[in-house]
């Protein structure tokens, strides 16, 4: 991902304020509510029958935290996202058979959640930088797909 020095600073400054546990669970939960077909990858998570059930599901929260932990790692390797996410790409492609479009959807949901949490601090410039990052991460995660 090519970011200007200003964009990198905007991304890392805001990310330093993110509660990964909270935002991760909320982002994954919103993905599952807004795009219900994505729930098929989470059969083992128990009750996903209503928006409240999804948003309060401890397994959704735990996996969201894990997902955002990987995203955090990616932020420290913006110049090598494909390498950083190679193993996760392989896992999601070969073993889990996740539609790579879902990575793009989750990235966009994450941007919405950040906007919700940070309000005026999440300026159009910050959003533009984050859109570049989530697009780069989605592309890296889709890299192993044939």
From Swiss-Prot:
This is Hemoglobin subunit beta. One of its GO terms (biological process) is hydrogen peroxide catabolic process. The modification S-nitrosocysteine is found at residue 93. It comes from Cebus capucinus (White-faced sapajou). Residues 2-146 form the Globin domain. Heterotetramer of two alpha chains and two beta chains. Red blood cells. The modification Phosphothreonine is found at residue 12. Heme b binds at residues 63, 92. GO terms for cellular component: blood microparticle; haptoglobin-hemoglobin complex; hemoglobin complex. Keywords: Acetylation, Heme, Iron, Metal-binding, Oxygen transport, Phosphoprotein, S-nitrosylation, Transport. The gene is HBB. The modification Phosphoserine is found at residue 44. InterPro entries: Globin (IPR000971), Globin-like_sf (IPR009050), Globin/Proto (IPR012292), Hemoglobin_b (IPR002337), Hemoglobin_oxygen_transport (IPR050056). One of its GO terms (molecular function) is peroxidase activity. It comes from the Eukaryota.
């Amino acid at each position: 991902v090519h970011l200007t020095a200003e964009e990198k600073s905007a991304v890392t400054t805001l990310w330093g304020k993110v509660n990964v546990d909270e935002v991760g669970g909320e982002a994954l939960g919103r993905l599952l509510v807004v795009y219900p077909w994505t729930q098929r990858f989470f059969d083992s998570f128990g009750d996903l029958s209503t928006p409240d059930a999804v948003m309060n599901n401890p397994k959704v929260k735990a996996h969201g935290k894990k997902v955002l932990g990987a995203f955090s790692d990616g932020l420290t390797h913006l110049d090598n996202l494909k390498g950083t996410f190679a193993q996760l790409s392989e896992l999601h492609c070969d073993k889990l058979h996740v539609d790579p479009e879902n990575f793009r959807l989750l990235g966009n949901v994450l941007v919405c959640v950040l906007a919700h949490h940070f309000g005026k601090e999440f300026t159009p410039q910050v959003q533009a930088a984050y859109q570049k990052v989530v697009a780069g991460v989605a592309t890296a995660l889709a890299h192993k797909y044939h």
